Swiss-Prot record:
Compositionally biased spans, kind Polar residues: 35-55
Cross-referenced PROSITE patterns: DNA_MISMATCH_REPAIR_2
Family: Belongs to the DNA mismatch repair MutS family.
Amino acid composition bias (Low complexity), ranges on this chain: 7-20
Species in which this protein is naturally found: Homo sapiens
Protein name: MutS protein homolog 4
Gene Ontology molecular function terms on file: ATP binding; ATP-dependent DNA damage sensor activity; DNA binding; double-stranded DNA binding; mismatched DNA binding
């Protein structure tokens, strides 16, 4: 918003009236994050581009006055006359508090690739003159009835700080979503790759990242800063002085702002100094960019440990197309697109965050699955909930606006508060219909959400609102409709002057309509009154059935625009009446705003129930979306054991974009056979299969049904993929170098609870080196209990099963079809996965045969390949002892698995064990019949 300039004075000095020169008494106290801040205690300013007054404090948290040497406007500058916003006695002091600047302009920051530095959060300089432009929008002060920001546009600000010295690697993070008044704190130890930090930031998808200036110093930046800037090229960076990362101040902010019901977070973070330091800097910065403060005891603050959810790194999220399609970079053909049938922005955001951070707690997942199952079985519950949920607005953004207290009383701030109070009334009136829709639900989670709707505070807040706000004031589409709702929101007889102002406004609107009607009669034209938020009232006319004399409108009409056969224009008299209308509106908004602020101050003590309502609505919306997705396909409820078993599973995204249902395949991975080597020709389905496994795993861990006839999953705490093999020109990385970086990341971070999917590792270098690298990587991963699926063209790797009994070989089948027209064989892809090594040898050469390569070249390639293969494979046969140990190993793992997971009755279990014993006896003699000497 525009801030009229004033003369620069010391904040601690008494204000002087520009017109009279008389000394005014200082303004009363202002809120500052729940604290009362007097003009004498306003923070000091240090501006790089202007000389700073002596005496500026260098200690964190010091509050002393200073003045800027930047040019100032004339002493008699003042706001426009007639406005109820901006010409109050406190105007000068408020402007001094809000007109602060950064130490470097945004343009210079862009040129040097270093972020601009915020020397102190507040400044008396003029932001117009300092050249600083804020990238973060002011949320909620839009007069429009629609959201200021779309549901998925970035709106998160993150502060990141790292320990120094022996504490290097200890990371503190604090983030706030401008559309959701919730602060999330994190503190964790990271390694030198900073994988956890990068992954966490990718999930948050920040609009802006704040760091300490000592971490980003030109020529001496930390490794963390370098890695973040490399991975987030399109994110804005801002640095502030290290002293504002103050853990003591951070703890004070939490004590002052956190709602009592969430105050247990204080116990969790008391000794977590780095996340406290991050939240101190974050809140100070948000106060600056939003030009507002949060009301005391109004924020939800929580601590999230890294162990509460599964980790999916950003490269894997891109490879699996969780949110963005790799072809057109949209969210249509993605896992999000498959599951997203949400009706509210909050539900959509919740689905997105769950896909990127799946749950790891089996009990919580099963509670969600119980809900989805009940929604599928009870159509009345499903459609009843869906009908009510679709009527909710963005409750999270609504809360975000309600809990902020603007530093300046502007027209936009007033209009926003009035609008959001109407939205709040609309939201609270949906609580009873939501309760009615849920009254017959049975599952524990749905019953818990139903219980949260029984909170008496919903009724208390709604009753307080209805004592002030008209019963028929409601949310309506269209800017003119919402303007009318805002004007007449407050009941009559509460403020006599407000009633008079509204009558005046009504008369002006009637006069405008009458004037346009008279103009239509005067010129015999079909004129009609129209309205837009930008132009106010104007005149429109269509020329379908009339002919204009000389193809011109009367000279009285000005600002004429034409779109097809429709004219839009105004007149000098209408412009004057619009000005009168706007002046009347400002009076109405001012008086309504005063009443609304008083009402909101009485609501803040009950605000916790609104957070519960927001959580309930977004969760119900997501669960309904899961149920909706199930009705469109034959998904099945997953089970959770220590085995990954999928019967006839298929790729969910491929199903959505294909005309025919994808080919289904089985998957079976256990602790005894936790390493699958998958071979097959190019385009046989290896990459699609790997992605399918990961997508099904994620769907199961967020509480969704999965595309299969039966499915059982082991909880994966990390999901890694190495699939993409494109060169990265921006970072000067070849295919091979990119492969090595990705596989190194996996090896550094994988553990026993990981799901690892690797596709064609080593193809970026020569065959010998590729095989050597793959073999070494396989041996390392085999030392873990992670579930690994390794797709490769190196058939030599298949013989590793002779050394490691937990290796299983699988392959994709192909069929050979005679091409009668060209008298050659063609490959028919079945996309079916089978056990054992592929019978296809040299399928690359077969693909070359059907290409345009000369036959002589293909023949030479075959001869050379045969010689190389004979040399490599001549000593890779297993001994009888290896085969015997392998058989014993598989029997033991089957017995352990049966003991852990069997749900068979005693008789069936006895039969199963008997059959298992027979199979072992049948297999065991064969191992003894293998000749001792296998050398040719």
């Amino acid at each position: 918003m525009l801030r009229p300039e004033i003369s620069s004075t010391s904040p601690s000095a008494p204000a002087v009236s520009p017109s009279s020169g008389e000394t005014r008494s200082p303004q009363g106290p202002r809120y500052n994050f729940g604290l009362q801040e007097t003009p004498q205690s306003r923070p000091s300013v240090q501006v790089v581009s202007a000389s700073t007054c002596p005496g500026t404090s260098g200690a964190a948290g010091d509050r002393s006055s200073s003045s800027s040497s930047l040019p100032c406007p004339a002493p008699n500058s003042r706001p426009a006359q007639g406005s109820y916003f901006g010409n109050k006695r406190a105007y000068a002091e408020n402007t001094v508090a809000s007109n602060f600047t950064f130490g470097a302009s945004s343009s210079s920051a862009r040129d040097t690739n270093y972020p601009q530095t915020l020397k102190t959060p507040l400044s008396t300089g003029n932001p117009q003159r300092s050249g600083y432009k804020s990238w973060t929008p002011q949320v909620g002060y839009s007069a429009s009835s629609s959201s200021a920001i779309s549901a998925h546009s970035p709106s998160v600000i993150v502060a990141v700080v790292e320990g120094r010295g022996l504490a290097r690697g200890e990371i503190g993070m604090a983030s706030i979503d401008l559309k959701n008044p919730q602060i999330i704190l994190s503190q964790f130890a990271d390694n030198t790759t900073y994988a956890k930090v990068i992954t966490k930031l990718k999930i948050l998808s920040p609009l802006e990242i704040i760091m300490s200036n000592t971490a980003c110093a030109v020529g001496n930046s930390t490794k963390l800063f370098t890695l973040i800037t490399e991975n987030f090229k399109n994110v804005n960076f801002t640095t502030i002085q290290r002293k504002y990362f103050n853990e003591t101040k951070g703890l004070e902010y939490i004590e002052q702002l956190c709602i009592a019901e969430f105050s247990t977070v204080l116990m969790e973070v008391q000794s977590k100094y780095y996340c406290l330091a991050a939240v101190a800097a974050l809140l100070k910065y948000v106060e600056f960019i939003q030009n507002s403060v949060y009301a005391p005891k109004s924020l939800k603050i929580c601590f999230q440990g890294s162990e509460q959810t599964a980790m999916i790194d950003s490269s894997s999220a891109q490879n699996l197309e969780l949110l963005i399609n790799n072809q057109d970079y949209r969210n249509n053909h993605t896992l999000f697109g498959v599951l997203n049938y949400t009706k509210t922005p909050g539900g959509s955001r919740r689905l997105r965050s769950n896909i990127l951070e799946p749950l790891v707690d089996i009990e919580t997942i099963n509670m969600r699955l119980d809900c989805v199952q009940e929604l599928l079985q009870d159509e009345e519950l499903f459609f009843g909930l869906q009908s009510v949920i679709s009527r909710f607005l963005d409750t999270e953004q609504l809360l975000s606006v309600l809990v902020q207290i603007p530093k300046q009383d502007t027209v936009n701030a007033a209009e926003s508060k009035i609008t959001n109070l109407i939205y709040l009334k609309h939201t609270l009136e949906l609580v009873d219909p939501l309760k009615i829709a849920m009254k017959n639900c049975n599952t524990p989670l749905l019953r818990a959400y139903y219980g949260s709707l029984e909170d008496k505070r919903f009724g208390i807040i709604l009753e307080k609102i209805k004592t002030v706000i008209n019963d028929d004031a409601r949310y309506m589409k269209g800017c003119l409709n919402m303007r009318t709702q805002k004007c007449y929101a407050v009941r009559s007889n509460i403020n006599e002057f407000l009633d008079i102002a509204r009558r005046t406004y009504t008369e002006i609107v009637d006069d405008i309509a009458g004037m346009i009607s008279q103009l239509g009669e005067k010129y015999s034209l079909p004129l009609r009154t129209s309205f837009s938020s930008a132009r106010g009232f104007f005149i429109q006319m269509t020329t379908d059935c009339i002919a204009l004399p000389s193809d011109q409108l009367p000279s009285e009409f000005i600002k004429i625009s034409k779109v097809k056969n429709s004219y839009s224009f105004t007149s000098a008299d209408l412009i004057k009446m619009n000005e009168r209308c706007q002046e009347s509106l400002r009076e109405i908004y001012h008086m309504t705003y005063m009443i609304v602020c008083k009402l909101l101050s009485e609501i803040y003590e009950h605000i916790h129930c609104l957070y519960k309502l927001s959580d309930t609505v977004s969760m119900l919306d997501m669960l309904l979306s899961f149920a909706h997705a199930c009705t469109l396909s034959d998904y099945v409820r997953p089970e959770f054991t220590d085995t990954l078993a999928i019967k006839q599973g298929w790729h969910p995204i491929l199903e959505k974009i294909s005309a025919e249902k994808p080919i289904a395949n089985n998957t079976y991975v256990t602790e005894g056979s936790n390493f699958l080597i998958i071979t097959g020709p190019n385009m046989s389905g290896k990459s699609t299969y790997l992605k399918q496994i990961a997508l099904c795993q994620i769907m199961a861990q967020i509480g969704s049904y999965v595309p299969a006839e039966y499915s059982s999953f082991r909880i994966a705490k990390q999901i890694f993929t190495r699939i993409s093999t494109d060169d990265d020109i921006e970072t000067n990385s070849s295919t091979f170098m990119k492969e090595m970086k990705e596989i190194a990341y996996i090896l550094h971070n994988a553990n026993d609870k990981s799901l690892i999917l690797i596709d064609e590792l080593g193809r970026g270098t020569n065959t010998e080196e590729g095989i050597g690298i793959c073999y070494a990587v396989c041996e390392y991963l085999l030392s873990l209990k992670a579930f690994t699926l390794f797709a490769t063209h190196f058939l030599e790797l298949c013989h590793i099963d002779a050394l490691y009994p937990n290796v299983e070989n699988m392959h994709f089948e192909v069929q050979h079809v005679k091409n009668t027209s060209r008298n050659k064989e063609a490959i028919l892809y079945t996309y079916k996965l089978s056990k054992g090594l592929t019978e296809e040898k040299n399928y690359g050469l077969k693909a070359a045969e059907v290409s345009s390569l000369p036959p002589s070249i293909v023949l030479d390639a075959k001869e050379i390949t045969t010689q190389i293969t004979r040399q490599i494979l001549q000593n890779q046969r297993s001994t009888p002892e290896m085969e015997r140990q392998r058989a014993v190993y598989h029997l033991a793992t089957r017995l352990v698995q049966t003991a852990r997971n069997s749900q068979l009755d005693p008789d069936s279990l006895r039969i199963y064990l008997s059959n298992l014993k027979k199979k072992y006896k049948e297999d065991f003699p064969r191992t003894e019949q293998v000749p001792e000497k296998t050398e040719e």
